[in-house]
Amino acid sequence: SQSSEYKELIETNQAQLEQVESEIRAAIASASRGSGSISGSTGNGSGELGYPTDSRSISAGYPNYSSGGYHGGIDFPVRTGSNVYAAASGKVILVKYLNYSYGRYIIIDHGNGLSTLYAHNSSIEVSVGDKVSRGQVIAHSGSTGNSTGPHCHFEVRVNGSRVNPNNYL
């Protein structure tokens, strides 16, 4: 029946998301070994991180449950092909393409337990192991994966857990 197919699809999507989250946490944990850790927030709008796009407009805030699931970042609506910038200096620890979830995404480790994720890119300009500088172009925006239109989905993680990006911008 249609309802059993729908239930199966939901279960498959949930399993895929759990696998993605597990891989992300493992990459962050591996990169963070020996670099110390931080706890808590740096304060509202600390400026510790730069904006990942030229746009300051936010189309989906943190957290957002309106789509029926958890949205653990903020979305910057931009045209496909717009520059996506490293929010701070660091090392690229994960570059991946999925036809679901984040689509083409990047994770940068900034040390001391702080990392950033940039998703739904049309192209990626860096590789795992690359050192990047704050403001460096790391990707071009798109609408890959589960996306409602071109934007940059941006997450900040502390010790692997998502936190409110607005506290760091």
Please report, for each region that a protein language model flagged, where it lies by residue:
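Alpha-helical oligomerization segments with coiled-coil/rod-like character
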Residues: 1-43
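Catalytic cores of peptidoglycan-degrading enzymes
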Residues: 45-169
